[in-house]
Each structure stands twice: as C-alpha cells, then as structure tokens.
Amino acid sequence: MRFVVGLTGGIGSGKSAAADEFARLGATVVDTDAIAHELTGPGGAAIAQVRRLFGDALVDAAGAMDRKRMRELVFGDAEKKQRLEALLHPMIRAESERRIACAPGPYVVHVVPLLVESPGFRERYPRVLVVDCPEALQVARVRQRNGLAEAEIRRIIDSQIQRESRLAAADDVLDNSGSIAAMQQQVRRLHEKYLALAAV
C-alpha cells in the first residue's frame, strides 16, 4: 500500500511551490489542478462533455474550456457548479488513482485544493498536510499571479472551507507566510518524516 500525503490549502497559500519542493526532493507529486487543466485543455478528455453540457460558448478557439467564463457561470449558480463537478471530479479521481498506483517515488504527495471538503478524505490519506498563510497574503499572491480583482479573490476564499476548519483537519501544517527558504526548510523536515512513515 503506497504512502500518500494529502496536501491542501486555500487559494494563494503556496500549495504548488511546496509541491514543487517535495518533487525536487524525490517524492511523486500528483496534482489535481494539473489533471483538471489537462482534461479541460485543448483536445482534453472532458471537452466534448463541457460542450454538450454548457454549450460552444464555454470552449475557446483553441479547443480548451474557457476557464474565466466557466468561473463566472458557476460562481452564482449552484446547479451549474454541481453539473461541472459531477463531470470533472470522477475523471480527476480516476486519473489521480492511476498516477498514484504507478508512482515511482518513495511516497506520493496528492495535491487536492478541496481535500477537506471531500467526503471520506480521512480514509484516503494517512497524513494531511495543510499549507497555510494569512488571508491578506493569499489575496496579494493571487492578485500578483492571476491579476484578479480583490473582490473576486475574496469571493473565491469565501467559497472555500474556512481556514480554521482546514487547520483542524491537518496532521501537519506548513506555515508559508515567510520566505521561500523558510518554506523549503519546512518541506525538507516533512520529507524526512514522510520517508520514515513510508518505510514502516
């Protein structure tokens, strides 16, 4: 049975940066956001269904899902959001499981933004790692990275599980409010811990 760490955190918390560091140290990283982008990218496996369920306007000229339009469509409409999740989540789960099963590293870091919101997550992950930082820093990072307006970023944060609930579910917390070097040092310590746990 492969040792899998579930890595989660709010938008802009630094999940990808932490996951990249785990990968650099030799862990296998399976990132659900990356899988979702593949599924909804040009010619992706979900595109035909996106077109069927939501119409041609949600697929751009390159043949990819128009993420900005989809975000606007589902944010105010619970039924459409549920329809999109019912399409993508099983595909993401199946591809994640396939990649985890054939992962070459000593353990797997499974990056799942909505991990704590997922039913049964406790049974799937021997360890849950939450990447955490203050909300103001989340907003600043996302503005810099994506150029979204602050109101839209706060709307996304409000739609996610509360920070306190996420932290309560954590076995390990990576405080990503400091420097890159400080984050890397924490990842190195956690990597040593996970190597030991994976060897048991």
Task: Outline where the language-model segments fall.
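Residue-level signal for inorganic ion chemistry
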Residues: 14, 33, 84, 109, ...
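Well-ordered beta-strand positions
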Residues: 28, 127, 171-172
